[in-house]
Amino acid sequence: MFSFVDSRTLVLFAATQVILLAVVRCQDEEDVLATGSCVQHGQRYSDKDVWKPEPCQICVCDTGNVLCDEIICEDPKDCPNAEIPFGECCPICPTEQSSTSSGQGVLKGQKGEPGDIKDVVGPKGPPGPQGPSGEQGPRGDRGDKGEKGAPGPRGRDGEPGTPGNPGPVGPPGPPGPPGLGGNFAAQMTGGFDEKAGGAQMGVMQGPMGPMGPRGPPGPTGAPGPQGFQGNPGEPGEPGAGGPMGPRGPPGPAGKPGDDGEAGKPGKSGERGPPGPQGARGFPGTPGLPGVKGHRGYPGLDGSKGEAGAAGAKGEGGATGEAGSPGPMGPRGLPGERGRPGASGAAGARGNDGLPGPAGPPGPVGPAGAPGFPGAPGSKGEAGPTGARGPEGAQGPRGESGTPGSPGPAGASGNPGTDGIPGAKGSSGAPGIAGAPGFPGPRGPPGPQGATGPLGPKGQTGDPGVAGFKGEHGPKGEIGSAGPQGAPGPAGEEGKRGARGEPGAAGPLGPPGERGAPGNRGFPGQDGLAGPKGAPGERGVPGLGGPKGANGDPGRPGEPGLPGARGLTGRPGDAGPQGKVGPSGASGEDGRPGPPGPQGARGQPGVMGFPGPKGANGEPGKAGEKGLLGAPGLRGLPGKDGETGAQGPNGPAGPAGERGEQGPPGPSGFQGLPGPPGSPGEGGKPGDQGVPGEAGAPGLVGPRGERGFPGERGSSGPQGLQGPRGLPGTPGTDGPKGATGPSGPNGAQGPPGLQGMPGERGAAGISGPKGDRGDTGEKGPEGAPGKDGSRGLTGPIGPPGPSGPNGEKGESGPSGPAGIVGARGAPGDRGETGPPGPAGFAGPPGADGQAGLKGDQGESGQKGDAGAPGPQGPSGAPGPQGPTGVNGPKGARGAQGPPGATGFPGAAGRVGPPGPNGNPGPSGAPGSAGKEGPKGARGDAGPTGRAGDPGLQGPAGVPGEKGESGEDGPSGPDGPPGPQGLSGQRGIVGLPGQRGERGFPGLPGPSGEPGKQGGPGSAGDRGPPGPVGPPGLTGPAGEPGREGNAGSDGPPGRDGATGIKGDRGETGPLGAPGAPGAPGAPGPVGPTGKQGDRGESGPQGPLGPSGPAGARGLPGPQGPRGDKGEAGEAGERGQKGHRGFTGLQGLPGPPGTAGDQGASGPAGPGGPRGPPGPVGPSGKDGSNGLPGPIGPPGPRGRGGETGPAGPPGQPGPPGPPGPPGPGIDMSAFAGLSQPEKGPDPMRYMRADQASSSVPQRDVDVEATLKSLNNQIESIRSPDGTKKNPARTCRDLKLCHPEWKSGDYWIDPNQGCTVDAIKVFCNMETGETCVYPNPSKIPKKNWWSAKGKEKKHIWFGETINGGFQFSYGDDSSAPNTANIQMTFLRLLSTDATQNITYHCKNSIAFMDEASGNLKKAVLLQGSNDVEIRAEGNSRFTYNALEDGCKKHTGKWSKTVIEYRTQKTSRLPIVDIAPMDIGGADQEFGVDIGPVCFL
């Protein structure tokens, strides 16, 4: 791909990236940008910028200073009817000729209409000196259309046009009188300013108005007003302009030279003095068709045009003679299906289908190929004579003449008379596609197509960046009080701001409506005792006594119902940026916006298929009768002489017989469109010609021209103009849409874009004989020769020598449309040509099918700040609100009312295209704008990158106040404004509707659970307290549903003229202009047409078949064949490129249940349970095996004397011996086998101490028991401080019979020192952590200063308040928080109760209004706000609600919040709203937070 990109394109691309980066960097560093720039009326100007804020004032920005000067006008002398052109300062005399040509004396007027100069063409002047660059002027007010002025001064040389067809030779005329030009001050004094962009002429190009009929030449315009003294330009080298000589005779055609290599660009020449207006240059030869460009981006929808009245269908004219190819007809309906033809060659690429779903933006593609030639631009100056073109291709082979040696080409014969059209031949087989021909002449535009249905609505774009803050408008008068509006929903409360200074008293509001009767007052005091009367007789009961004195006044009654709403204060200054609220749900589709401005021209659409044969055209007008030439005698043929020099053209001879059709000559340059010819007389239809032989496939042609623009889409809603996104990759081809119905015939438009030749139209009525036309298509067959045997195809012959130039025939009448040529193969990419002029917008394309609505995309990253958008019109002055003093900076505020409408921000970056929405209803057509002044023609440049955003325009003049419109729909929530000045305390408003449930509040610390109080009896309604001060602004609530659209307000007056904008897009197609003056003589034309066919020679003998010739050049395009039969299925194509990722599919149906998975690996061992209860004693065990023999015991005491032994053998009696020694037990120490003899120690055991062995057994048993208990306590902890459990759930599992109570847990395990004491609910297994402290004392905590009520955070805002904490005082700080972090991880549910004790304070439901607007907010431990209403995940419930109204008695509301997001609990803060009055008190019991 890289090899195809011209290196210059890369350099240009790199440069644009650098510039773009620089621009972005400058936007980020506004202080750098501002150095040297100036600001006037809110508009920023760059250094050295020049502008005219008023017609008679001109200003310049000089390194940060604005220097303005008044324009001093000279009185026009001897001018009774001096005029001041619209938007100008000084009067001009319409008839006075300007005598200055230097540009320094008098400013030139606007460019006049072209003068009617019949035969005058002045000589081209030498180039003038280069002037310094001028500054871009502001856009002037639109002037009234002046009378037609004399020709303006010569403009700057335009780009050389591509050579047109040679025009007829006009006699050289004298130069025309110099006319008064437009305001060329910037041009004359400074040339072009590099910064001025496309608006270098100081005139904004408006849309092209309809061209009127050519008027008579106007009187010469008066000299323009005095211009500023320009800096003198460097002196140019004046060339002596000689007069133009008469045209010389055409020289003989030279051989075409080889193309030279492109030279390096020369240095810019110095600017010459302006020459007289040059003649219009010829249109250049259309380039060969290029390769099809990438699919263009869809243009913005244009505004809907008014449907023209349907024209009456004319009567069909008689069939005329086949003319030269006509303009392309409108696309017709598809014909009936033809018989299947033989398999044809590969066809041209088909139309692109309907747009596929939008893909993500692709990378920036390479520069596209040049587009088709646009519609004719305004008249350019004559370009330099182009180089001689190469010789044309060889024509088709002529019929065999009498054999002979070819003689040199003779001079052109006199024109012959037209032959009778031959009968239509039968259709030949389709030939192989020839090489692409030059594009045919531009056809007239087709009738206005039917407006397509409104396109689907796109997704909402990213919000634009906020614009610069506008200047403060003038202070408006205080408006009359509006009608009382319905009470708005109460905003959510913000956090408390610092206390503000008291504001000045505002004006008294209108009296409120009569309040409801107050409660009955207390009885008055007893009156004084009357004097005691004398006792009388008991009388009859007397009449009632006199009325007693009035008692003391009772307590004041409750305030009455709210009075009417006071005047709206003016919006406060913008507050700090609030926290971003959650994304609201998508609103309903808004009404269609007004038509957007005309978008940039889209890239051309693909060329449509040729339409069917058009209807017969109306007969043309009769052409002027030509002069009869003197009849020449036909001479006998002489011998072939050598070619003589070109003689002068002889007089026209008499009409000869119609010669045989010569081969087509080389293509001439495209001529200017001729005037419509007179209608021809009806000719017979010509026979279809014999199809030519199939030509060899042509070489790959050069890249084709840009395709026709697609049809104009209907007007879409006005979008914010974003910077141009990267081009997306082309979507896949969709199915071909059905052809729409033909619209009514529109008025004749100017020549449309270059079309491919259409099919041959029906012949028109034959007109009177015109002058000789261009070479026609091949005529009927000549005198029949004998059929020769068909020779083999010969080789391509070399190009023949150029023939002598023939006389240029007059333009013939336009013939019917020619046939459509086959599409050529794409050629190699040509070098980048000069930018063509901008084409007109094409007709609208067919609407794409509506795409599925895509899922809501994730929010994109915030884009770079766009440049400020254009200044919107100032709104009507609002009523003046009372001025208060600034309040202290508040904490988080509630959602403010919608702010005043800001100026539109600049467009943000374009997001990826959303899927098409459903079509919206048609918008009302906008009113027609005023006709703008005709802009000077700019040179068409290549498609530039998206321009940098323009500077912000100055604020418009405030319009008159319009009538009040109906209430509009609620605007989107604006960013919260800053705290406004406190107003005077207003009348209590009606209760608002129940608001949406808010976000969860911050978690508060929990307290010990209070005992459940019995419900108190409802007290009487107490008097309302004074209104509290404004609370802090709460976070933005969820967006409300979109209101109904209000009716449109009356249109405001036109604003003041804005500053001149950047160059506008090319306007819509104007009406056809008057024909221009004849052009200057063109360069020497190429070879002339072939002379008349000679008479048939005598029939020669049939020659032998020649050898096979090389393949001939492709023949001319044959007539369109019948539709072929469907071809055989082609071979399977190569695999296409990978498609783009499709849209997210809908979720599939649930799948079937999977097979049972394999058993997972065994989990890790659970924590050791608590020790079990001591079991009952076991049964006695059986005797164990005997142990080993123990060590020898201590020496025993001496034994008792043993019993006397049996009598011994009688011996000699001796004396008794002494006691024997003790037994040495060491002798038995080694014995361990008792079976070998009796246990030697068995007699000793009874002697040992009885306590030694049992004591040892007890110690071992105790140790074992202790170890067993420890192991059991690890396996089954008992919830003591020494042996804490991990959670209460573990305790419940190990000891299900235990009762609820306080236990110790250690969720993070490890050392037990940081265990915490909690309440275990053994019914549920919940672990409940106590708050510390667990109560907020009951008292009046807050005294409000203002009348607005807001939520006041207890721990963050209230003096003496605190955030709730949890755990035991005895633990180290943060211990409970750490353990709760682990506890949250071990739990899936959390719950907490808060009891709000109230006295004249609403906690949840406001019984008076029936809504939850005054409900308290809670703050969770992860800073989320928990509310009474709104998103169900962040809302709490009220288990008991005794704080519904003000009764003057203490009551309570029990709030419960349950969640599976354990990170939201515990509650750490509470924010009541209904507090601040002297009689409003509250207290809070914080319940424990429980995890399960």
UniProtKB/Swiss-Prot annotation:
Main location group: secreted
Segments of this protein annotated with the region Disordered: 98-1255
Entry superkingdom: Eukaryota
Region Triple-helical region: start-end pairs: 206-1219
PTM statement from Swiss-Prot or TrEMBL: Contains mostly 4-hydroxyproline. Prolines at the third position of the tripeptide repeating unit (G-X-P) are 4-hydroxylated in some or all of the chains.
Subunit and partners: Homotrimers of alpha 1(II) chains.
Residue ranges, compositional bias (Pro residues): 163-178, 213-222, 438-447, 1204-1221
Protein name per UniProt: Collagen alpha-1(II) chain
Disulfide bonds: 1288-1320, 1328-1490, 1398-1443
Record comment regarding domains: The C-terminal propeptide, also known as COLFI domain, have crucial roles in tissue growth and repair by controlling both the intracellular assembly of procollagen molecules and the extracellular assembly of collagen fibrils. It binds a calcium ion which is essential for its function.
Residue ranges, compositional bias (Low complexity): 197-208, 223-234, 321-333, 340-355, 366-376, 396-436, 480-490, 501-517, 627-636, 645-655, 711-741, 838-850, 894-910, 919-930, 1105-1114, 1140-1159, 1176-1186
Protein purpose: Type II collagen is specific for cartilaginous tissues. It is essential for the normal embryonic development of the skeleton, for linear growth and for the ability of cartilage to resist compressive forces.
Propeptide, residue positions: 27-186, 1247-1492
Fibrillar collagen NC1 domain segment(s): 1258-1492
Any Pfam family the entry gives: Collagen
Subcellular locations according to the entry: Secreted, Extracellular space, Extracellular matrix
Modified residue annotations for 4-hydroxyproline: 664, 673, 676, 679, 913, 919, 925, 1186, 1192, 1207, 1210, 1213, 1216, 1219
Positions with a binding annotation for Ca(2+): 1306, 1308-1309, 1311, 1314
